[in-house]
Amino acid sequence: MEKFSVTVIGAGVYGTAIAVAIAKHGNMVLLWGHNSQHIKILKIDRSNQVDLPGVFFPDSLYVEESLSVAADFSQNILIAVPSHVFRCVLLKLRLNLKNNFRIIIASKGLEPKTGWLLQDVVYDVLGKEVPCAVISGPTFAHELAIGLPAAIELASADIKFRYDIEHLLYSVKNLRVYKTTDVIGVQIAGAVKNVIAIGVGISDGMGFGANARAALITRGLSEMIRLGKSIGAISVDVFVGLAGLGDLVLTCTDDQSRNRRFGMLLGQGMHVDYAQKSIGQLIEGISNTKEVYMLSVKYKVIMPITEQIYKILYENKNVHEAVYSLIRRSYIL
């Protein structure tokens, strides 16, 4: 089987996991992170014991502190950093990139303040001629790293690039790749699912049971579809596929999800600030909620679940009042 090379930008839990998964099958992978002390520990331990205990690096996985070396390693640059630092990382990367590079976005969410899709941030910083792809889907990092079966969605309008990345990912054992050209839909799905997961967590934390959970997931999917179609998603297909429904169900129902656990703490009566501290890791859904809500206002999309979660997080609304507002709202949709 043909071997590939890729540079992974972002040495957190997901970046490390996908680097391990790709390198495990003989592909040449270089992992870069911004925290030099963290990178030194990864080099020494040949593992990320903080985020992925017990998962060790294959011989074909290299760890690097120099962004210049990382950028020069491969034309395929996979970015797996939080959405709020995405632009900053691209700006640093731009100073080191050579010709013919290609960007794979593994980050999920929207850019804070602008609400831009991350692909649009790539085009804004690196130019619209850059080949760009997005990967998304129900893939918890630890399961991906240890090689449990999973499926992922690959989106790109660049057919040649999509073909190359499909074959790179195809080399990963137990990973099934599905293709789409709906780049907008995949990115919107990746942001909205985090918001709904907080809502489902709140419901479960309040002890509302399986019926309420199923209702929130279903109506959350409707909100995802409405927003996606308003912004320019090609069809409903991607939302009922892996990047949409698949990732939504995973994030809403499994306690590996930080967004779900955060919501559960809110539902149990914990204040937003204390719940964040209790989780102890970045919760993408908090910033995603603000950006998704602002997009819903901008495009005049009715998203009642998102609206109530926004009010809980940013307007200090009581969770019980938010639930009552949802139950008693008019039957518009």
Swiss-Prot record:
GO molecular function, a single term: NAD binding
Positions bound to NADPH: 14, 34, 108, 141, 258, 282, 284
Top-level taxonomic group: Bacteria
Chain positions recorded as sn-glycerol 3-phosphate binding sites: 108, 137, 139, 193, 247, 257-259
A Pfam family matched in the record: NAD_Gly3P_dh_C
Compartments it resides in: Cytoplasm
One GO term (biological process): carbohydrate metabolic process
Record flagged with keyword Cytoplasm: yes
Pathway(s) where this gene product acts: Membrane lipid metabolism; glycerophospholipid metabolism
UniProt KW keywords: Cytoplasm, Lipid biosynthesis, Lipid metabolism, NAD, NADP, Nucleotide-binding, Oxidoreductase, Phospholipid biosynthesis, Phospholipid metabolism
Residues the record marks as active site: 193
A cellular component term, taken from the record's GO annotations: cytosol
Alphabetized Gene3D superfamilies for the sequence: N-(1-d-carboxylethyl)-l-norvaline Dehydrogenase, domain 2, NAD(P)-binding Rossmann-like Domain
Catalytic activity: sn-glycerol 3-phosphate + NAD(+) = dihydroxyacetone phosphate + NADH + H(+); sn-glycerol 3-phosphate + NADP(+) = dihydroxyacetone phosphate + NADPH + H(+)
EC code: 1.1.1.94
NCBIfam families: PRK00094.1-1, PRK00094.1-2, PRK00094.1-4
Free-text function comment from the UniProt entry: Catalyzes the reduction of the glycolytic intermediate dihydroxyacetone phosphate (DHAP) to sn-glycerol 3-phosphate (G3P), the key precursor for phospholipid synthesis.
Family: Belongs to the NAD-dependent glycerol-3-phosphate dehydrogenase family.
Protein name: Glycerol-3-phosphate dehydrogenase [NAD(P)+]
Organism the protein comes from: Blochmanniella floridana
Name of the gene this protein is made from: gpsA
